[in-house]
Amino acid sequence: MTDKIRTLQGRVTSDKMEKSIVVAIERFVKHPIYGKFIKRTTKLHVHDENNECGIGDVVIIRECRPLSKTKSWTLVRVVEKAIL
C-alpha cells in the first residue's frame, strides 16, 4: 500500500512555546441548506525543531507520529516570512 503523507499550508498564530508553534488552517465549507461557502479554521500544534517560525509566517506542515498529547505535525518549510 502506498500511503500519502498529509501536508497542509497555514499561518502561524503562536510561537510562545519552546520548539512548538500553533498553525491555523483555513478551509471553505459549503452550507448544506443555503449553499454559501463559510470559512472554517482549524488550529494544529506543530513541532518546530529549530524555532525558526514567527507569528504570521506561512508554513507547510506534514503529519507524523504523535510527539505529545496534542502534537502530531512537523514543520516542513517556511513559505513566506511575516512582514513586521
UniProtKB/Swiss-Prot annotation:
It holds the Pfam family Ribosomal_S17. SUPFAM superfamilies: Nucleic acid-binding proteins (SSF50249). InterPro entries: NA-bd_OB-fold (IPR012340), Ribosomal_uS17 (IPR000266), Ribosomal_uS17_bact/chlr (IPR019984), Ribosomal_uS17_CS (IPR019979). One of its GO terms (molecular function) is structural constituent of ribosome. Belongs to the universal ribosomal protein uS17 family. One of the primary rRNA binding proteins, it binds specifically to the 5'-end of 16S ribosomal RNA. This is Small ribosomal subunit protein uS17. It comes from Erwinia tasmaniensis (strain DSM 17950 / CFBP 7177 / CIP 109463 / NCPPB 4357 / Et1/99).
